[in-house]
Structure formats: structure tokens, C-alpha cells
């Protein structure tokens, strides 16, 4: 896989708040013509909020809280046309002792804004995802988190292990299967869009407007 470090300027803003749990904010932005979408690959993110607007850029804002918040960095690169968002620790960071781990929790929340008709991919064992808007394609692979799509238009695949799947959409053909959960799914057999939803233990709910 070819990886190219983005040569465009990245806008980074660090904001430190003097609270019990200090906070760090990282903001990145690229012109939308440089990538067909975003790929979040991280098991450290707690929540991801995504929306499409009339913007000409793709922007990602990370809010990081916790005692070791200052060691979190984002290394954004473009791979196979997707803006890959990976989180890592800064150079020189040493892993904390297991006995202190419970007191050194770091919470990471991502806010992603991008133009309509882009792709969004998420692979995470922790994150819950909320998305709103029009997309070309989505692909969500989540373990513990939920996936909620509101006022959603687009095709894609959503897989969860324990998390629930909730979709509000229209004109969409839906294939859904949950092994141990409860499903209540509205589908349009001749719909313009196509969603495949699958969960092991999570409930699946799909509603469609006219």
C-alpha cells in the first residue's frame, strides 16, 4: 500500500483548559478534492460525530481529555484516496504503570465535517458513531460502540459486535440481521440506496421517511 504524507498545510490548534481534566484540541483541514473520503482507524476513540455540509473542505477536530492528554497526536496521511486518521503517542511517551492505569484514562472524541457524497470508513473496537447527511458510501466496523445514522442518505455496510444500529433514512433497500438482538426494519425493495446491517448482540432499528 502506497502511503504519501500530505504536502498541503495542516491547520493545528491546541487549546489548553485549566480544569481537573485538562483538554487538548487538535484541528486539521484539507481541500475536499484531495481525498474521496475519511478513514478512521483507532481503538482509542470514544465517540465520532460526522456530518455533511456545503463546505469545500474536509475537517477533523479531536477533543482529548485526561491526565496524559498532551501526549496524544494525530498523524494524518492519504492512503488509496482516503484521508487516514490515526492517533498515536508523541515521541518520548512512556506507558504508564498498570497500577496507575485506572487513574490515567484518556477520552478522545472526533468531530468530522465533509462535503456531501464522500466516503466514510471507521474501524474501532471502542467508538460509537453518529452520522448525519448525504454520503457516497459508508463502512463501519464497530465492536462495543453503537452506530446511529440520522437524516441519512447513502449506501454502505455496518457491522457491530455488541452495539446497536439505528438508522433514519429514505428510499433505501435494507438487508439486516442480528443474531441475539431485536430488529425492526423498514425497507424499500426498489430503493435508490442499499444498506447492509449486521450485529451479533445489538438491536437494529430502521425507519424511512417518504
Placement of each model-derived feature along the sequence:
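Bacterial Sec-dependent N-terminal signal peptides
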Residues: 1-27
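Short, functional N-terminal and low-complexity linear motifs
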Residues: 9, 88-90, 106-107, 123-125, ...
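Acidic (Asp/Glu) and glycine-rich low-complexity loops/linkers
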Residues: 23-121, 150, 155-157, 166-178, ...
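Right-handed parallel beta-helix
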Residues: 121-157
Amino acid at each position: 500500500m502506497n502511503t504519501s504524507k500530505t504536502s498541503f498545510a495542516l491547520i493545528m490548534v491546541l487549546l489548553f483548559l485549566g480544569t481537573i481534566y485538562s483538554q487538548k484540541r487538535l484541528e486539521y483541514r484539507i481541500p475536499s478534492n484531495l481525498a474521496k473520503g475519511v478513514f478512521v482507524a483507532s481503538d482509542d476513540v470514544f465517540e465520532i460525530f460526522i456530518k455533511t455540509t456545503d463546505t469545500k473542505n474536509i475537517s477533523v477536530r479531536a477533543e482529548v481529555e485526561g491526565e496524559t492528554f498532551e501526549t496524544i497526536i494525530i498523524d494524518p496521511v492519504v492512503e488509496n484516496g482516503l484521508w487516514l486518521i490515526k492517533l498515536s503517542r508523541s515521541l518520548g511517551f512512556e506507558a504508564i504503570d498498570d497500577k496507575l492505569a485506572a487513574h490515567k484514562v484518556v477520552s478522545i472524541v472526533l468531530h468530522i465535517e465533509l462535503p456531501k457524497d464522500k466516503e466514510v470508513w471507521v474501524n474501532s473496537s471502542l467508538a460509537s458513531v453518529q452520522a448525519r447527511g448525504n454520503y457516497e458510501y459508508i463502512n463501519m466496523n464497530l465492536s462495543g460502540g453503537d452506530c446511529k445514522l440520522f437524516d441519512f442518505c447513502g449506501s454502505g455496510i455496518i457491522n457491530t459486535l455488541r452495539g446497536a444500529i439505528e438508522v433514519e433514512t429514505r428510499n433505501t433497500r435494507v438487508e439486516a440481521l442480528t443474531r441475539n438482538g431485536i430488529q425492526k426494519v423498514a425497507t424499500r425493495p426498489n430503493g435508490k440506496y442499499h444498506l447492509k446491517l449486521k450485529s451479533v448482540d445489538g438491536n437494529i432499528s430502521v425507519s424511512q421517511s417518504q
